[in-house]
Amino acid sequence: MVDLNCDMGEGFGIYSFADDEEIMPFIDAANVACGFHASDPNTMRKTVELAKKYNVKVGSHPAYPDLVGFGRRPMKMKREEIKNLVMYQTGAIKAFLDEFDMPLNHIKPHGSLYGVSAKEEDVANGIADAAEIFNVGIFGMVNTFHEKVYKERGVKFYGEFYSDLEYDETGYLVIAKGRNQYYPTDRAVERCMRAMKENKVQTIQGNDVDVGCETICVHSDTPNAIEILKALREYISPKKNSSEKSTNGNHSKMPYIIAVSYTHLRAHETD
């Protein structure tokens, strides 16, 4: 079974971030912003309702309380504060899920919370503390405290690969200023295929590093995101209960998740 996951609901008030409904038919799971880096109650409810319409599972997308900075700025917080932060936001999205009789599927930290938790054990443990309360898994990066902490504690861990971002020699993501750039579809697909088969990716320095590939992330702010998604679907698997069918029969049984992200935040700061 193949799941496809996307960061969604990241507009607020009269401001929109991306066309959620355009991408929703391609995905199986949505990480919904919970109000701290983006979104508001009306947007959260609308996004959950849209997910139900397209039979999409929903997870929370908690962040540092940084609406102005879109959750991109790290904050110094104790483990208990991180736990409470994630519980508060996840509880908010779960309230809307309860209204639509939908379960909470997972947690995927956003932006700097994702990046800091990859490097700092206490932060990763704070997120795991919250995940245990909700009894759900977490999306993250292999060979970081994401994998170490979550696996040691028995929290389900999904190793994530990014199709449209480069990696450095340490295995962290490289984000340049003005990230909303076209990423060649063929290259994105080629990198994903190698990651799935070998769990490797070539870095910007030219060496290979190990990567996880249970979930593949495509950012919605990549101008050709839909093109990349369609190409990946052809190689990997059609969405369940979708009219989108793969022409590559053998690939349809590959057990991977495609993750489409509406964020471009990272575990490795480059500016």
Tell me the role of every PLM-derived stretch.
Residues 225-237:
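C-terminal helical cap(s) of enzyme catalytic domains, especially alpha/beta-barrels
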Residues 12-44:
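A short alpha/beta connector and helix-capping loop motif
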Residues 22-25, 47-57:
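Acidic (Asp/Glu)-rich catalytic clusters
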Residues 7, 61, 107, 218:
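Conserved, mostly hydrophobic/aromatic
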